[in-house]
UniProtKB/Swiss-Prot annotation:
PROSITE patterns: THF_DHG_CYH_2
Chain positions recorded as NADP(+) binding sites: 166-168, 232
Matching Pfam families: THF_DHG_CYH (PF00763), THF_DHG_CYH_C (PF02882)
Catalytic reaction equation(s): (6R)-5,10-methylene-5,6,7,8-tetrahydrofolate + NADP(+) = (6R)-5,10-methenyltetrahydrofolate + NADPH; (6R)-5,10-methenyltetrahydrofolate + H2O = (6R)-10-formyltetrahydrofolate + H(+)
Source organism phylogeny: Bacteria, Pseudomonadati, Pseudomonadota, Gammaproteobacteria, Alteromonadales
NCBIfam families: PRK10792.1 (NF008058), PRK14186.1 (NF010783)
Name of this chain's protein: Bifunctional protein FolD
Amino acid sequence: MTAHLIDGKLIAKQVRQHVTSYVDSLTQAGKRQPGLAVVLVGSDAASQVYVSNKRKACDEVGFVSRSFDLPSDTTEETLLNLVDQLNEDKEIDGILVQLPLPAGLNAEKVLERIHPHKDVDGFHPYNIGRLAQRIPALRPCTPKGIMTMIESTKRPVKGLDAVIVGASNIVGRPMSLELLLAGCTVTTCHKFTQDLKSHVQRADLLVVAVGKPNFIPGDWVKPGAIVIDVGINRVNDGSLVGDVDFDKAKERAGWITPVPGGVGPMTVASLIENTLEAYVKYHS
């Protein structure tokens, strides 16, 4: 058996096309376009690539994209003042502060300063709390994108054993809330988990987000499982690989995401969806 590939690039393209059509209808009706403010502090190379992709996606769907590139020695007060200004700006529907922030800046404080209705990354405690209470508003982008990918398989997930490897605030923890909401029986594995192999082997749905190349051996994967690989790691030969041993896993899984071209494009697509949702729900 060879797994079906879940093509994140294709699904993300479909999402962008849907958003573009909606924005076109707004323009034709004489209404303003949704606006996204993207704030980058410092010159981290990876962050610059991520921000560039997000700005490009905004332009593609017809959003107004405002860029704020600040030096690495920016003070916390300056950054918080900028967030306050963007919170008050009626042309801006979403605010994205690219992480990680340089040393000396409190990311938690900055993210909590963003108004929950403009928190298109979905990281604000208000939005995480809404998800936990089963009344989601703006949802964290990567888990939201993963749910869209899972839905594309057409496999019903209610009652499935779902195992998440990794318990970060960005992916693992909100992913567990998403899968609970979808009706899965959810296990979250972390650095203190004992006998990781036994958990992975029983997973009908496996999400791995640890940032370690080929961390999960492919022969651990349950036959027919849905495998979502969030990791993207550059190895010694310069190639990009995920957190799961793809070559072996694809021979056992029913569906699997490639790396690259899997989860990454869907994270950006979900950001675009969230910005449109913020516009429609809160600011139009």
